[in-house]
Amino acid sequence: MLARFPLYLRLVRMDKPIGSLLLLWPTLNALWIASDGHPRWPLIVIFALGTLLMRSAGCAMNDYADRDFDRHVKRTADRPLTSGKIRAWEAVAIAVGLSFVAFLLILPLNTLTKELSVVALFVAGTYPFMKRFFAIPQAYLGIAFGFGIPMAFAAVQNTVPPLAWVMLIANVFWSIAYDTEYAMVDRDDDIKIGIRTSALTFGRFDVAAVMACYAVTLGIYVWIGIALGFGAAYWVGWAAAAGCAVYHYTLIKGRERMPCFAAFRHNNWLGGVLFAGIAAHYLMAGS
């Protein structure tokens, strides 16, 4: 078992934390806004660990669902499950175990949060199979990656206000943007094996679609900033996020694999500076 532990870590992408961070930033945005800038530390820990666990569970389930496809893709052919180094039942067991631990984390929270966690689990568990049916499965991914938003509001306020759903919509568009960049890396392989992705659906308009999704995401956060009366610190963070989006355009406009992958990875900075702007606003407002 100990000898296989490094393989399990690779299965759940512990060596690639970018995915966890893409889940974490929107969740932290929601925690800070829901609590008016004063989230309780136990909640921060619960949601941070829950994000890590559920992303890891999602990776294991994704590899299980895609095990017959990944062997045909150069980038994924050496994954532990695809290469036969671990077995399918192990991936499923790990996904179930991590999901159970994540649920244990939220047991101290209110009933509404626990009810929403069931929905979140369903969405996360079914996403890997959506690539067979949906033309833009990245939209479904955005719901899965963003469900920490309504859960955060529920945990803090014991209700899910319209603002939470607006933030979730913003996350859906952001997810379409960054995961389309990711899909542009595997475009040729996905055509051969018949997987549906937004990069294939958008076709020659893929770059324009990515930038349009960034524009919608940032536009929603303009509305949020105005509606909540955020100050200059927030707008500095927003401007930095907009700058990241412009930088991504320079990377993806040539549609080359490595620059597109770099743009995907750089979304960590976009999410991070936007959260920094929100946190800085509340910090300065309370000083």
From Swiss-Prot:
It is found in: Cell inner membrane. One of its GO terms (molecular function) is 4-hydroxybenzoate polyprenyltransferase activity. PROSITE patterns: UBIA. It comes from the Bacteria. Its cofactor is Mg(2+). The keyword Magnesium applies. Keywords: Cell inner membrane, Cell membrane, Magnesium, Membrane, Transferase, Transmembrane, Transmembrane helix, Ubiquinone biosynthesis. The chain crosses the membrane at residues 41-61, 89-109, 133-153, 158-178, 218-238, 267-287. It is a multi-pass membrane protein. Pfam families: UbiA. Its EC number is 2.5.1.39. It catalyses: all-trans-octaprenyl diphosphate + 4-hydroxybenzoate = 4-hydroxy-3-(all-trans-octaprenyl)benzoate + diphosphate. InterPro entries: HB_polyprenyltransferase-like, Prenyltransferase, UbiA_prenyltransferase, UbiA_prenylTrfase_CS, UbiA_sf. GO terms for biological process: ubiquinone biosynthetic process. It is an enzyme of class 2 (transferase). Pathway: Cofactor biosynthesis; ubiquinone biosynthesis. One of its GO terms (cellular component) is plasma membrane. Belongs to the UbiA prenyltransferase family. HAMAP family: UbiA. Catalyzes the prenylation of para-hydroxybenzoate (PHB) with an all-trans polyprenyl group. Mediates the second step in the final reaction sequence of ubiquinone-8 (UQ-8) biosynthesis, which is the condensation of the polyisoprenoid side chain with PHB, generating the first membrane-bound Q intermediate 3-octaprenyl-4-hydroxybenzoate. This is 4-hydroxybenzoate octaprenyltransferase. It comes from Burkholderia multivorans (strain ATCC 17616 / 249).
